[in-house]
Amino acid sequence: KNGKVFFSTHKGYNEISNSKKCVDNRTRFNRAVNFAKAVNSLPELREIWKYSNIEGRSAYTKIMSYNMKLFHDTNPARTNKISPPGFGFHADNFIITNNSISVDVKLVQNFKELRNIKFTANFVVALSERKPDMEEFSFPYAVAVSEYTPVLDSEYQNVTAVFNTFERDNVEAYTKAMVFIAFTNIERKPYIHSSSLARGMDIIQT
């Protein structure tokens, strides 16, 4: 005004609600972020999500947008997915120890087209119920990979993945796990991948 510059200030109000609904929403969002980080840390899963038709600008945002609504309360559930929809398979006899994950798998469709293709078995483990005497970890997830080549159309094949030292130390701090598994092959386009399955279980300490 009249060649002069005036500044006005006012006190801002940005109160954060502590209602149960708002707290749960924030907790769910933070846990969805951790879930997406864990899935996105596996290179083949990241590549599969990146080129999927799921809404989002990157693999990470696609994982987030797809999974946010699937969380049960504030925790990952069996309905959450570490891969977009793909070919189906059966999984049985899940076993997780502080050293490894083991599961028996069998394809349920497109067997002839998928036989003898070498897949990467991707495991993402959501950890819960930390032992009271163990240091709290800020990232309660572990990941592991292995190989799987379907050769039998009527029998289960065992797939086992071993944790590295960092993942093993993390798993040892918890007593329960939700194990997610999905298969990927990105050697040539179009990429081939399965849907994902999950099971909740106790961790066997060895």
Task: Show the residue positions of the predicted features.
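Long, polar/Ser/Thr-enriched low-complexity segments
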Residues: 1-90
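Charged linear interaction tracts used for macromolecular binding and regulation
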Residues: 52-206
